[in-house]
Amino acid sequence: MIPILFFYIPGWCSSHNFYVTLVSKKYFMSLDFHPLSLADRSLVWKYTENAGRRNCDLSFANLYAWRMLYRTEVAEWGGFLVFRFYADGHLAYLMPVGEGDWCAILQALKEDACRLSHPLLLLGVCEDLMPQVEECMGEDCRVNANRDHADYIYLRESLALLSGKKLQAKRNHVNRFKALYPDYRYEELTDEWVPACLDLTRRWVESRQDEAEKRAVAAESEAIQRALAHREELDLRGGVLLVGEQVVAFTYGAPICRDTFDVCVEKADVEFEGAYTVINKEFVSRLPEQYKYVNREEDLGVEGLRKAKLSYQPEMLLMKYSVWSSCTVKAEIEECGLTPEQHLIKWQTRALWSLCFGDTEEFMKLYFTRKYTPERNSCLVRDGRVVAALQRLPYRMMFGGEDVSMAYVSGVCTQPECRGKGLMTELMLL
């Protein structure tokens, strides 16, 4: 007997249409995830070395350095390697790496997400893999391309030589740096230089003025500390740029696949004009020739960073798509009587709760399946997104000799960038 699953896509339209998928029993083999550790390096490389995938998300050095922030887990399934993590409170999966039945693995991910009461969110889906997604998921998904997360990929030789008219300005930067600081030198990154690199990172964090930006760079600082603490285990290559005995720039990276090297981090003291250009050139010129390409990662929508990355004349911009597919069962709508709008608000509130409190999946599932109702949830929506929410849980108590209906307020949460703007006061007065 073939089981029938019903999938609903929140927020697509105002209708209550359901999409029915017939699923083979083999798709229900569970994924055995475990927290990513240093011991997984050889496992990851086994899948990524010859996969031809060049996106920076698959660099083991990145995966490990950021694992605490994203709570990254890994599993093997049906010839594929899968990463599961949390992005801004949303359960998410990287597009699987490997060879096998694509429809089977995508269905397995959908079922895993459903088991954890989440819709399926796939990240890092490159354009060459979109045919597999479309074939297996059909209309049962939404696709979004975000230019801010496109990877900048360069020819190694181009960055090493800076030849040609278009890179004349870069050569000028290098020559000016050499003229200003004739006592400069480049050294391989070793344990000797790690304290100075961390000190430069600390000063970089402290230079930020905006509080939201400070939080973001503080997270990157922690990732840098974690990577440098395990430099050898992660197979990092790196370099430092010195003027006299002062470290004015450092960088490091690691392979993504056989022909592509990822520059994970590059930091420089901006007081030393041209330091960024010089550390980049010196480092890349020493990479093995097997690496035809160098990935210098995303610009994250930062205008200055985008301008700088484009100025090096990338060979390609690797677009990465996010794919969203809901796998909540039909009962969520029919039995609970939620409208599509209420359903979407529930998922967004759940994601915000997870982002703010970091509760376990067991607790989240318990609350949002047994206690949550639209009536108990007060939220503020801006541009289609829940930016603040709180829960009003009913209870009764004796007050002044009378049995009075009360509400206990809990789950008070606000998007980080919206804090300090009076949103919770507005909510409490609703």
Residue ranges and their predicted role:
Residues 57-129, 242-272, 347-421, 425-426:
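Conserved donor-binding loop and adjoining core beta-sheet/short helix segment
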Residues 144-152, 315-328, 397:
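Conserved catalytic-core motifs of GNAT/GCN5-like acyltransferases
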Residues 24-56, 161-223, 327-394, 401-408:
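Short amphipathic alpha-helix that is part of the acyltransferase structural core
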Residues 281, 425, 429:
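Residues forming the Rossmann-fold NAD(P)(H) cofactor-binding site
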Residues 222-239, 243-319:
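Accessory, usually C-terminal, subdomains that scaffold auxiliary metal cofactors
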Residues 8, 18, 25, 45-55, ...:
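Secondary-structure boundary/capping micro-motif
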